[in-house]
Design a protein with these regions (language model features):
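Structural detector for internal amphipathic alpha-helices that build alpha-solenoid repeat scaffolds
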Residues: 1-2, 27-39, 49, 59-79, ...
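N-terminal "cap/leader" segments of large eukaryotic alpha-helical scaffolds
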Residues: 1-31
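Positively charged, low-complexity intrinsically disordered regions
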Residues: 7, 83, 156-157, 164
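Buried hydrophobic core positions in alpha-solenoid tandem helical repeats
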Residues: 12-13, 46-51, 85-90, 120-122, ...
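Alpha-solenoid helical repeat architecture
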Residues: 13-24, 36, 51-55, 92-97, ...
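Surface-facing alpha-helical segments and adjacent helix-coil boundary elements at the starts of domains
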Residues: 50-54, 63, 71-72, 86-92
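Alpha-helical scaffold repeats of the Armadillo/HEAT/TPR superfamily
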Residues: 83-88, 129, 158-160
Length: 166
């Protein structure tokens, strides 16, 4: 497996504990998310690159930070951050990364993506991997009735697991 340089932001997380921020104080966690967003797309992409195919816990910091970014961007007043993050997450979901990674990213999109993001994710409704297919279908359903026509068309054109999932 190719060695990926880990994001400097993961080093700011303490040892894992059973709490919302994995042991970091809420204010420190909020500053950490703000610093990542301030650094921009490269910082978020670096976290995504750090995700492992097998969720063995080795990449818990990247997963926690990507999740906290999604939660942060779910606040209505953060539309600018949400737009940037949605684009980065959608790009990662559409990439050739392992299905487990793409599925995780799609799960995070459920926290803040809306129906305007659905057309860009349409190719994933034909994905051959059930993990990705289930995650994108759940995402589209969570976007509400605005995605109904997209899902109906995708279901008509689908076969196998896709037909059941959609």
């Amino acid at each position: 497996e190719k060695k990926i340089k880990r994001s400097e932001f993961v080093e700011r997380l303490p040892a894992l504990s059973n709490s919302r921020w994995g042991g970091i104080k809420k204010g420190d966690g909020d500053r950490l998310v703000a610093d990542i967003l301030k650094r921009g797309a490269d910082a978020v992409s670096e976290l995504i690159e750090g995700l492992k195919e097998v969720d063995s816990g080795e990449d818990w910091q990247e997963r926690l930070l990507l999740h906290q970014l999604a939660i942060h961007c779910s606040v209505p007043a953060r539309a600018d951050d949400r737009k940037v993050l949605a684009g980065l997450y959608a790009s990662a979901a559409l990439s050739k990364r392992p299905a487990t990674v793409r599925s995780f990213i799609l799960q995070q999109l459920r926290y803040f993506a809306d129906a305007t993001h659905a057309p860009g994710l349409l190719p994933l409704l034909a994905d051959e991997d059930p993990l990705v297919l289930d995650a994108v279908t759940a995402l589209m359903v969570s976007m509400g009735s605005a995605t109904e026509k997209i899902l109906e068309k995708a279901r008509r054109d689908s076969k196998g697991h896709a037909r059941v999932a959609i």
